[in-house]
Protein backbone atom coordinates (compact mmCIF):
# COMPACT_ATOMS: atom_id res chain seq x y z
CA UNK A 1 0.00 0.00 0.00
CA UNK A 2 2.87 2.36 0.80
CA UNK A 3 4.40 1.74 -2.65
CA UNK A 4 1.12 2.59 -4.33
CA UNK A 5 0.89 5.81 -2.36
CA UNK A 6 4.44 6.72 -3.40
CA UNK A 7 3.69 6.01 -7.06
CA UNK A 8 0.51 8.08 -6.97
CA UNK A 9 2.35 10.94 -5.29
CA UNK A 10 5.07 10.76 -7.95
CA UNK A 11 2.43 10.80 -10.72
CA UNK A 12 0.73 13.81 -9.12
CA UNK A 13 4.08 15.65 -9.01
CA UNK A 14 4.74 14.84 -12.67
CA UNK A 15 1.30 16.14 -13.63
CA UNK A 16 1.94 19.31 -11.60
CA UNK A 17 5.32 19.80 -13.32
CA UNK A 18 3.71 19.37 -16.74
CA UNK A 19 0.76 21.64 -15.85
CA UNK A 20 -1.70 18.77 -16.42
CA UNK A 21 -3.47 18.78 -13.04
CA UNK A 22 -6.53 20.65 -14.31
CA UNK A 23 -7.11 18.30 -17.26
CA UNK A 24 -9.38 15.25 -17.22
CA UNK A 25 -8.14 11.68 -17.71
CA UNK A 26 -8.94 11.66 -21.45
CA UNK A 27 -6.95 14.84 -22.00
CA UNK A 28 -4.03 13.53 -19.94
CA UNK A 29 -4.01 10.30 -21.94
CA UNK A 30 -3.82 12.29 -25.18
CA UNK A 31 -0.91 14.34 -23.80
CA UNK A 32 0.93 11.19 -22.71
CA UNK A 33 0.39 9.59 -26.14
CA UNK A 34 1.93 12.65 -27.81
CA UNK A 35 4.91 12.50 -25.41
CA UNK A 36 5.31 8.74 -25.91
CA UNK A 37 5.18 8.99 -29.73
CA UNK A 38 7.70 11.84 -29.76
CA UNK A 39 10.01 9.95 -27.41
CA UNK A 40 9.85 6.64 -29.29
CA UNK A 41 9.41 7.74 -32.91
CA UNK A 42 10.80 11.26 -32.95
CA UNK A 43 7.60 12.55 -34.55
CA UNK A 44 3.90 12.63 -33.79
CA UNK A 45 0.97 13.81 -35.86
CA UNK A 46 -2.71 14.12 -35.11
CA UNK A 47 -3.53 10.88 -36.95
CA UNK A 48 -1.04 9.01 -34.73
CA UNK A 49 -2.86 10.27 -31.64
CA UNK A 50 -6.29 9.33 -33.01
CA UNK A 51 -5.07 5.82 -33.94
CA UNK A 52 -3.23 5.21 -30.65
CA UNK A 53 -5.83 6.65 -28.29
CA UNK A 54 -9.02 5.14 -29.64
CA UNK A 55 -10.72 8.49 -29.06
CA UNK A 56 -12.81 10.19 -31.72
CA UNK A 57 -11.21 12.61 -34.15
CA UNK A 58 -13.34 15.37 -32.60
CA UNK A 59 -12.13 14.62 -29.04
CA UNK A 60 -8.49 14.56 -30.13
CA UNK A 61 -8.76 17.80 -32.13
CA UNK A 62 -10.56 19.63 -29.30
CA UNK A 63 -8.00 18.46 -26.75
CA UNK A 64 -5.02 19.38 -28.93
CA UNK A 65 -6.55 22.82 -29.52
CA UNK A 66 -6.95 23.19 -25.75
CA UNK A 67 -3.29 22.22 -25.26
CA UNK A 68 -2.22 24.62 -27.99
CA UNK A 69 -4.09 27.52 -26.35
CA UNK A 70 -2.43 26.64 -23.02
CA UNK A 71 1.02 26.59 -24.70
CA UNK A 72 1.53 22.89 -23.92
CA UNK A 73 1.65 21.72 -27.54
CA UNK A 74 2.77 23.36 -30.78
CA UNK A 75 0.91 22.35 -33.95
CA UNK A 76 2.78 22.67 -37.26
CA UNK A 77 1.54 21.82 -40.71
CA UNK A 78 3.46 18.91 -42.24
CA UNK A 79 5.77 19.89 -45.08
CA UNK A 80 5.29 16.52 -46.78
CA UNK A 81 1.50 16.32 -46.50
CA UNK A 82 -0.32 19.64 -46.15
CA UNK A 83 -3.40 17.79 -44.82
CA UNK A 84 -1.46 16.53 -41.78
CA UNK A 85 -0.28 18.40 -38.69
CA UNK A 86 2.77 17.51 -36.60
CA UNK A 87 2.77 17.96 -32.84
CA UNK A 88 5.60 19.22 -30.66
CA UNK A 89 5.58 19.49 -26.87
CA UNK A 90 6.16 23.08 -25.80
CA UNK A 91 7.67 22.14 -22.38
PLM feature segments, named:
Residues 36-41:
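Short helix-capping/hinge SLiMs at alpha-helix to coil transitions
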Residues 63:
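Residues in the recognition helix of alpha-helical DNA-binding motifs
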